[in-house]
Amino acid sequence: MLVCFLFFYDKFPLLFLIIFHTKSLRKDFKFRYICFLMKKAVFSLLCISLGLHVHAQNTGKDIYRPEQEQINNLIDTKLDIKLNFDNQSIDGKEWLTLKPHFYPTDSLTLDAKNMLIHQISLVNNNGNTTPLQYDYDLNQQKLKIKLNKTYTRDQTYKIFIQYTAYPEGVPGRDKKYYSKDKGLYFINPQGKNSYIPTQAWTQGEPMDNSGWFPTIDSPNQKTTQEISLTVPKNFVTLSNGTLTSKIDNANGTRTDNWRQTQKHAPYLFFIGVGDFAVVEDQWKGRPVNYYVEPEYKSVAKEIFGKTPEMLTFFSEKFGYEYPWDKYSQMVVRDFVTGAMENTTAVSHSQTAQQKHGELVDKNVWEDVIAHELAHHWFGDLVTSESFANLTVNEGFANYSEYLWREHKYGKDYADELREEDLEDYFSGNNFHKDLVRFDYKKVGDMFDRVTYNKGGYILHMLRSYLGDDAFFESIKYFLNHHEYQKAEAQQLRLAFEHVTGKDLNWFFNQWFFGHGHPKINVVTEYKPNEVVVNLKQTQSPLFEFPLTIDVYENGKRTRHKVWVKKEPLNTFKFSTQGKAQLVVVDGINDIVVEFNEEKPVDLYVQQYLLCKDELPSRMQAIKKLAYNQLISKNALSTLITAMKDPSAGIRKLAIESLDVTDSVVQEQAEEALAKIAESDPKTLVRAEALKKLAQIDKDKKYLNLFKNALKSESFAVKGAAIDYLSQNAPEELDNLSEDLDIKLAVNSPRLLEKLIPQWRQENKINYFPELNEMAALYALMPYIKPEYAKASQMAFDWILSTNDLASTQAIAKVYSNYYKFMKENQKEAIPFLRAMANNALELKQKTYQQYPNDDLKKQIEVLEEVINEIKD
């Protein structure tokens, strides 16, 4: 699953997607996973300005979370369910086939959340039924069934359950307006909201599918399945496996039957229902379909069209052909995570739906698409036996994003992703967490940057250490020997050892079953005929690992392979013909490590110029040179040179790094910026150059350049032009602002300031989805993106003064997701978050006082619930 914070991508660089497989956070706020980063400096400033007290975080290891005991094993699950949109419930019939795991048993315990149980019977071989005694504890969410006799491990039995499930809460009990653990979610079920489609969809991971059918809701269970799904006739359905029949009913409904004959874990069950356009594709004769809102039908293949190529790539790379009968992907509204790898029926958040102009710039969801597909080997075919071992699923899926980029676009672009992921991991409060850990407080804690990012790039280290042939042969062995079964990290180790003949306990013990990573101070001594590299490990525990050290002489590189021992200080000496030009530690950038090293500016210049095939080294050099551009001519000239780098990522970084408020920088960079803004092959680079030119151009010298940019297909280029013209030539936008796509408008804070009052007057609440997050975080904008401060405040005032449940729920979800991140990583900021939520509540209460009605009362309850959730 990809956990991601659904933020504004390029608009707010401190608030961005992680893709994070994310299924990153992939499951809350990888994607990308993708995850929320807020720099400590920002929060320190907020806390000082608000006088907030900072609390220390207590940690302890007094919890043990074992794999769930297997008493009974699922064999087959058959469901006959009817969705009731009016009261948001399910009428269900279920036939479960099971057998004892080992010990004889006369009872069965199932997970069942928020249900009314009507009857339970044993189904005999002839189809007759015998009532069974049962006890349902609604508070414990357990259904305990007394079987008719004691069964042994070679005996199967089938039970029938008739039930009604209430994902929103059993009538008479508290409802969960924005809870993430319902299992089944009804979106705009009565169709009251004109701009939100009516849908129903499920999210099972970690253990939530027991919210819509009774099951043993544990990842170490595997079952085949059949689902008969009755829905309004005008809706499309999707579930796991093959659609075997569609029957129109006399009452205006239709029953679709889906069957999957290969077993998988209960959390991977999925149903999706709604008004979707279905765009058909195929791979080796198997259906590959894309379910999107009708508005996005024309771009569905732009978004998802690389899926067949990915299927071929991963099948070949993993040495195991894609095993399932189809591969469908559905984009759903108000998804509680980034994406989810439901077997053959992947669900994506609406962020996946992009306009053509956005896709011209970059398909921001491509990493997620690769991530979820890779899960069909790691997670669906072979499933981690417990959430303590979740990285067996998520580490591989996360690393598969890198593998896809490397294959399709080259190593530089893959290394950009690695740099982002590791920066994300290093920035969080992650050092003291074991990768495989049995002491998590809540299962949701496992869906973090350790499981995803660290787990993925530990695999990258293992690949580098063993070599490609051995690494991928080991993966093939692992998949073939554990197909349709559960597995844990120790079995992964054994697979690698079986193939390579190497003992890998040293690797797995420190990287999988231990915590942290090396933190190393580097001091390099350049001598006439020798270089001496001193590496001091400053962390505990100490690590051992192979390392490359590159020594450059006369423009040529010599790569040395050394072994860093578990010692505080490791010193390595290398002979040279004269004085070396440059030494780069970890030249191939394959270790999960934080280096602390300071070099003179001229050495960073050399690092950029000499490390032509190692993007991370060039990127590090650019970041260091940016700090010195105002005091070093060489630093500035190298930044300008980097604006022509073969890597678009480096070009964009170099442009972003320019301080064009300085007259010398302006003078030297202006001509190059103008050329790049006009003709760079990558629109995101052009857009960045336009933004810098906009800061320089006080006399409208480049007005025509910006007017021409307004004609671009690219949303990034067009957005940069709009922002410039809204300040310098607003008349150029007179004919544009009427039909301006909201996704373009949010690129321009100045234009938003003009348009939001107009939209408010015209009651264009259909724009709320693009404004909700900006509005929710209005109080942060003066600190992280000052130019959006006024527009975000205007959006906040408008949305919270409007009777709109969907937007209120969305804003509450923003606060909830931020809180989940902050309590682990930035506890000092929680009071500030609560203050924003309280302000939202106060404004909604004022609206209710003016226009009292049940909908506004419900919105107040939604905000009160999230405020109660936010604790110090």
What would you call each of these model-derived segments?
Residues 231, 246, 374, 482-671, ...:
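Non-catalytic accessory/interaction domains
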Residues 1-60:
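Bacterial Sec-dependent N-terminal signal peptides
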